[in-house]
Swiss-Prot record:
One GO cellular component term: large ribosomal subunit
GO MF entry, a single one: rRNA binding
InterPro entries, A to Z: Ribosomal_uL15, Ribosomal_uL15/eL18, Ribosomal_uL15/eL18_sf, Ribosomal_uL15_bac-type
Keyword Methyltransferase: no
Annotated organism of origin: Protochlamydia amoebophila (strain UWE25)
Protein name according to UniProt: Large ribosomal subunit protein uL15
Gene: rplO
Region (Disordered) residue spans: 1-52
Length: 150
């Protein structure tokens, strides 16, 4: 006869953890399911992703395709016109050194690019590595001298 206290949960939500190294009667004693010797028996061993046990791995069978120019792209630290307006005074020079002193650039890039966000009314001298079209238009309208350095 089946009673409520004798029912077993056939689909456990949490399986009991596998206790290894607890004697030969448990099926996971001595070598703990790792086999005898070799890398798999040692601690710290992890199978490499895509390893296929002697067979040529799939990623090596497939041909190389395409080309990515990402490793050659030029990355710039960017600064906007409104940032120059807020920090620099009339007659000052905006260059890599002055921007680094004020904490605007990190230095792990190919230079500085000036973007056209905001307006510039102060007469400053600008020496940067690249300028966007909108920034170039605003600088010529404001009659601010700028130079693109290499």
């Amino acid at each position: 006869m089946i009673t409520l206290n004798t029912l077993k949960d056939s689909t456990r939500k949490r399986k009991p953890r596998k206790r290894v190294g607890r004697g030969i009667g448990s099926k996971h004693g001595k070598t703990c399911g790792r086999g005898e010797k070799g890398a798999g028996a040692r601690s710290g061993y992890k199978r490499r992703l895509g390893k296929e046990g002697g067979q040529m791995p799939l990623f090596m069978k497939l041909p190389l395709r395409g080309f990515s120019n990402a490793q050659f792209r030029r990355q710039f630290d960017v600064i906007n016109l409104d940032q120059i307006e807020a920090v620099f005074k009339d007659g000052e020079t905006v260059d890599e050194l002055s921007l680094r002193e004020r904490g605007f650039i990190s230095g792990r890039t190919h230079g500085i690019k000036l973007l056209g966000n905001g307006d510039l009314t102060k007469k400053v001298k600008i020496h940067v590595h690249a300028i966007s079209e909108s920034a170039r238009e605003k600088l010529t309208q404001a009659k601010v001298s700028f130079e693109i350095v290499k």
